[in-house]
Amino acid sequence: MIDLRSDTITKPTPTMLEAMFEAPVGDDVFEDDPSVNLLQDKVAELFGMPAALFCPSGTMTNQIAIRINTSPQDEVICDRNAHIYLYEGGGMMLNSMVSPKLLVGDKGRLTAAMIAASINPDDIHRPNTRLVALENTMNKGGGAIYDFNEIIKIASVCKKNELKLHMDGA
């Protein structure tokens, strides 16, 4: 039986375990781990970026992305069932001191129009909308995926309104 409920349920195969056992290792704190360095270099090259950072979990990756793209008292637009809201222990509120604006998408998928209508006006009494966080595939949406053209429209809304866009690749 193949169990696809979560990546946390799977176990490595004997071949995977052998590859891990045989992999060259070093202290990543001192950037001495050749396996991690090679992975980061390949990912940076793939995305045309000067550098990449390997994180041991999706939750850590999401929390870093939220923190570097927001300031305390900012607002993050996401679906009400988003992993970053439901399953990360309140991390965005604790680590980044931001407020979530929870929208109700179709199986968790937001639209460009929904996002545009949800951006706060410039008002001292309201948090600054700073980040839009999407999830693809949408866990609580039964694995629903975004239409690529909708992502392009969402990115356009974000660019027009000077918002950052984060994609949780759950």
Label the model's feature ranges.
Residues 160-161:
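Helix C-cap/helix->beta junction micro-motif
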Residues 23, 129-138, 165-170:
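Short beta-strands and strand-loop turn motifs
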